[in-house]
C-alpha cells in the first residue's frame, strides 16, 4: 500500500490473482441505430413512438450493467403548443415500458426534454437530444425507441420530417 510503480510503455502486466479496486465505468459495447428519415405526428398528450421508425437494439452482457441511450431527433410544435420526449423500452420476452424517464421520475408529463411555442408565432422546430441511463437488469435483447407527445395546447406536434434524420446510439456501461 502506498507504493508507486512505473510501467514502461509497451510493457505487459500479468496478474496471477484477482485485480480489485479499479471500479466500473468501462464501455462494454457500443450500438448505433440505422438513421431514419420520416415524420410522425400526434395531437395527443399520450406518448407515441416517433422518429420515422428508428429503433436501437442492444443485448447486455451482464444484468448488473447500465445502458446509456441517446436519440437525436427533430421536433416541431404548431404555435401555442408544446412537445416533450421520452423513450420506450421493450425487453425481449418481457415487458414493454412506454416512457422510461417518466416511469423512473414519477412524472406523468415531463419526459426527458422538449419545448413549447408561443401564441401567434408559427411552427417552432428544434433538434432535441434524449439521454437516459437505464438499469434494465437483464441479459435479454432490449429495443429502445424515441417517443413524444403534446405537452400543452390543442394542435399538432411532430417528431422528424421528410428532410431530417433521426439518429441514436447505446453504450453498455460495466458497473
What are these regions (language model features)?
Residues 2-39, 175:
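Glycine-rich, low-complexity segments
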Amino acid at each position: 500500500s502506498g507504493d508507486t510503480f512505473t510501467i514502461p510503455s509497451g510493457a505487459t502486466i500479468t496478474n496471477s490473482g484477482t485485480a480489485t479496486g479499479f471500479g466500473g465505468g468501462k464501455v462494454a459495447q457500443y450500438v448505433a441505430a440505422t438513421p431514419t428519415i420520416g415524420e410522425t405526428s400526434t395531437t395527443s398528450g399520450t406518448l407515441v413512438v416517433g422518429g420515422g421508425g428508428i429503433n436501437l437494439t442492444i443485448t447486455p452482457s451482464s444484468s448488473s450493467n447500465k445502458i446509456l441511450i441517446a436519440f437525436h431527433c427533430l421536433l416541431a410544435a404548431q404555435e401555442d403548443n408544446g412537445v416533450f420526449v421520452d423513450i420506450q423500452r421493450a425487453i425481449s420476452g418481457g415487458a414493454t415500458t412506454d416512457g422510461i424517464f417518466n416511469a423512473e421520475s414519477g412524472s406523468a408529463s415531463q419526459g426527458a426534454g422538449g419545448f413549447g411555442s408561443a401564441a401567434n408565432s408559427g411552427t417552432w422546430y428544434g433538434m432535441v437530444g434524449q439521454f437516459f441511463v437505464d438499469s434494465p437488469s437483464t441479459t435479454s435483447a432490449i429495443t429502445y425507441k424515441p417517443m413524444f407527445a403534446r405537452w400543452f395546447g390543442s394542435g399538432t406536434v411532430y417528431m422528424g420530417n421528410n428532410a431530417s434524420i433521426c439518429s441514436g446510439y447505446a453504450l453498455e456501461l460495466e458497473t
